[in-house]
Design a protein with these regions (language model features):
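Compositionally biased terminal segments of proteins
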Residues: 1-95
Length: 95
């Protein structure tokens, strides 16, 4: 299991996704953490807009964040699969 998800990771997602132009929403406690709620959670939950350009930007942003995506995982993100769990990066993330 990756380290607990905290504000620094939320800010890093925000910054890297902005740099890649990814359209997304933080969901659940990860969103509250980014807004300053003083807590941690086990992972981040994000809703990513399901367009082809956004999906490709998401794959690149995740790799920049340090996620080691298999070809199958990258393909799931690119095709807009409804639920993708990633446990192969600096923290756990659900898309």
């Amino acid at each position: 299991m990756a380290p607990r998800f905290e504000y620094a990771q939320a800010a890093e997602i925000r910054d890297v996704f902005a740099r890649h132009g990814v359209r997304y929403l933080f969901l659940g406690k990860s969103g509250a953490i980014l807004l300053g709620f003083p807590d941690t959670t086990q992972d981040a939950h994000l809703f990513v807009e399901k367009t082809s350009p956004n999906a490709e930007a998401t794959v690149q942003a995740l790799r920049d964040l340090g996620f080691v995506l298999s070809e199958d995982e990258a393909a799931e993100v690119r095709r807009g699969k409804d639920f993708v769990q990633l446990r192969n990066g600096p923290f756990d993330i659900d898309l």
